[in-house]
Amino acid sequence: AKVANSTDSSSLAEVIDRILDKGIVIDAWVKVSLVGIELLAIEARVVVASVETYLKYAEAIGLTIP
């Protein structure tokens, strides 16, 4: 059982390392309405990446200040 736990944690570490290295963007849009009347609308964009990865891509698309 200890071998499986060790493998699982190293796999999780590899996944987290890859996400921080490559980055991931989660786009969410939620709308709550009742009888055709919109009560709540939420839009969210979550970016998960290392600072180095973010700065590299932000510079490539012109989001950083020169």
Swiss-Prot record:
Record's subcellular location: Gas vesicle shell
Annotated keywords: Gas vesicle
Predominant subcellular localization, coarse grouping: other
Molecular function GO terms recorded: structural molecule activity
GO cellular component terms, A-Z: gas vesicle; vesicle membrane
Keyword Acetylation: no
Sequence intervals crossing the membrane: none
Annotated function: Gas vesicles are hollow, gas filled proteinaceous nanostructures found in some microorganisms. During planktonic growth they allow positioning of the organism at a favorable depth for light or nutrient acquisition. GvpA forms the protein shell.
Family membership noted in the UniProt record: Belongs to the gas vesicle GvpA family.
Subunit structure: The gas vesicle shell is 2 nm thick and consists of a single layer of this protein. It forms helical ribs nearly perpendicular to the long axis of the vesicle.
UniProt-recorded name of the protein: Gas vesicle protein A
Species whose genome carries this gene: Thiocapsa pendens (Amoebobacter pendens)
Upper taxonomic lineage: Bacteria, Pseudomonadati, Pseudomonadota, Gammaproteobacteria, Chromatiales
